[in-house]
Amino acid sequence: MSLAQTIMPEGYIFPPKPVPLTQNEQGEYKARIKQLLQEKNAVLVAHYYTDPEIQALAEETGGCVADSLEMARFGTRHDADMIIVAGVRFMGETAKILTPNKTVVMPTLEATCSLDIGCPVDEFSAFCDQHPDRTVVVYANTSTAVKARADWIVTSSCALEIVEHLDELGEKIIWGPDKHLGSYIQKNTGADMIMWNGACIVHDEFKTKALKDMKALHPDAGVLVHPESPEEIVALADAVGSTSQLIKAAQTMSNKKFIVATDRGIFYKMQQLCPDKEFFAAPTAGEGASCKTCAHCPWMAMNGLKAIEEALIDPKGKEVFVDMDLREGALKSLNRMLDFTATMAK
């Protein structure tokens, strides 16, 4: 395995945490948003990492709470004129790529992703040009321009199977941008892969020694790990998988306690589906370090009720647009993934 040398820019300033709302304020916002969703024939699609009140609102209004793959599928099936995407920028762009005739709006277009930031298209494209014999496989957590440069798009719920398929065909792979997920896939498939050197700031913070200490305190707890985590964290897992796969593991495993190494936004759905089980966030501090994200994506946290209401009242400045030429290339890569995952489901 080899790594390209570009990582997320140093000194990047993360967005401030939003001011929390009181229960009464949440109720008032929710009531107004529900009315606006009806008036605009709009549907709310939320990622598992958004805050609990956002996920609850999506469920209450007939929307969708899901991983990025199912979020992409949902918008194509729904008859709404407007899709409100509560997540990060690449999710809104993916929705627009797949449903160009619908209005796609986000609570804020500033909600980005460290993997996207750390994979600028010019540098990534130049890296790909150095290896013209390789198939370019990129994680969904990337811009439309990077997707257009790729041969395949994958999410964490299908990446292993798609790379395994390509390896069986004898293809050599360029993988980007998450080095930890790439390392996990390479280890499990044996595929010939060269990696871009990106990482998720949330998963990259999990601490190995602190997790071992937590396991010692809760020896009966199962450890659930997202493969965006460092290799040393993955090695301590009882189950490794995407958000939807980790939720399923929490449901099916016999443990009554779980230590979870992914964004703590996932606890809403885990606790909803497993009310008799207890969940602990894997440690992101310790070993002489304090946490920056503390197991919650700062950009996911930008998707507040106030921002959703504002986007519905006036989408100007919050609507997602993609370059139509880039869309064509990105759509081909996305459709390869969607077609492949459709065969997986059979």
Curated annotation (Swiss-Prot):
It comes from the Bacteria. Coiled coil: none annotated. It is found in: Cytoplasm. InterPro entries: NadA (IPR003473), NadA_sf (IPR036094), Quinolinate_synth_A_type1 (IPR023513). Iminosuccinate binds at H47, S68, Y139, A140, N141, S156, H226, P227, E228, T243. Its cofactor is [4Fe-4S] cluster. GO terms for cellular component: cytosol. [4Fe-4S] cluster binds at C113, C200, C297. Binds 1 [4Fe-4S] cluster per subunit. Pathway: Cofactor biosynthesis; NAD(+) biosynthesis; quinolinate from iminoaspartate: step 1/1. One of its GO terms (biological process) is 'de novo' NAD biosynthetic process from L-aspartate. It catalyses: iminosuccinate + dihydroxyacetone phosphate = quinolinate + phosphate + 2 H2O + H(+). Its EC number is 2.5.1.72. NCBIfam families: nadA (TIGR00550), PRK09375.1-1 (NF006877), PRK09375.1-2 (NF006878). Catalyzes the condensation of iminoaspartate with dihydroxyacetone phosphate to form quinolinate. Belongs to the quinolinate synthase family. Type 1 subfamily. PANTHER family: QUINOLINATE SYNTHASE, CHLOROPLASTIC, QUINOLINATE SYNTHETASE A. This is Quinolinate synthase. It comes from Pseudoalteromonas translucida (strain TAC 125).
